[in-house]
Amino acid sequence: MQPVLKRKLKLLLTICVISSISGVIYQLVDADHIDFRSIYLGLNLGLSFGVLELFILDRYQQQFQKLPFFWHLVIKSILYTIIILIVAGPIVLLLELREGGDISGFWNDLFSPGFYSIIVYALIMYTLLVFYMQVNRMVGEGVLIKFLWGRYYKPVEEERVFMFLDMKSSTTVAERLGHQKYYALLDEFYHEISIPVLKNKAEIYQYVGDEVVFTWKTKTGIKNLHCIQIFFDIMERLEQRQEKYHDKYGLVPEFKAGVHFGDVITAKIGDLKRVIVYNGDVMNTTARIQEFCNHYNCKLLISGSLLDKLELDETYSASFIDTVKPRGKETELDLHCVTKKY
């Protein structure tokens, strides 16, 4: 199953569960009892909302991102109001007929204060869900839930793999395109990497200009060679879309990357702006490894210590390049260039 589809189906299931539970809570507060109607209505509303949000409106995500966040919420709230009315009406009719009622009873229910209180309740709930999903996108996949659960409020030492991915000849590209078009190129590229990121279970730590930093817990990063496969998946997507980049920007961006692993201190810092940061020697070392890519004419350089942890299959080739002492470091480091055979 494709990683994006798998992620969407998981989200859809979560939305349906939350919606059903919300229906039960509403009925408990309103009627002091529970029956299947609250679950049935909540499940169908959640399913409709999830399909609309994840499979229909998601196709227009880039257009929505151009809107101010407020108008993004307003437009979607209007759409959800329409969908809720379309879905809730037939369900109320079905329940009315099932319980021996008739059309007149349906119309009475449809224009009753109780029906509209359900609509308002559902609209508020789904607007909050959209708000959460959009904020989650803004701060980074999975980061918001870590804040909500208080993870990393106290510093934690953990072992992680890092990849520093950087555009080659970025200064030349920026001068050629101009600042506006250059950042449009970067934004388009950062959208391109979504599928490789999900497929290889990477976390996007930060964007720094034309550089993006990926991270994994070591166990996740080395499993199925995620920490190197992501690079080749990204390059493959660029190759598949090279004609589009040529037509739009007159070039196809090229990237280089350095990968290393080690211990870091992970913690939440800040007051007015709170972020989760990683602090450790591995960060500087990985950045230095990436800087050697141009010198050794290699697109993907990894440390010898990381290579020892990886079980490369016949798909990949790792060639020893050199033993170096990165700038500002006392210990030497073996560098290996990784290529993909096919």
Regions found by a protein language model. Name each.
Residues 155-229:
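Catalytic NTP-binding/metal-coordinating core of nucleotidyl cyclase/transferase enzymes
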Residues 52-61, 69-113:
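Hydrophobic transmembrane alpha-helices
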Residues 15-19, 37-58:
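Generic alpha-helical transmembrane segments
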Residues 295-342:
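Cytosolic regulatory/linker segments at or just downstream of nucleotide-handling modules
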Residues 260, 281-304:
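Catalytic/regulatory signature loops of cyclic-dinucleotide turnover enzymes
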Residues 97-158:
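Regulatory cytosolic signal-relay segments
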Residues 1-40:
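Membrane-anchoring hydrophobic segments
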Residues 200-226, 242-281:
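Catalytic core of nucleotidyl cyclases, primarily class III adenylyl/guanylyl cyclases
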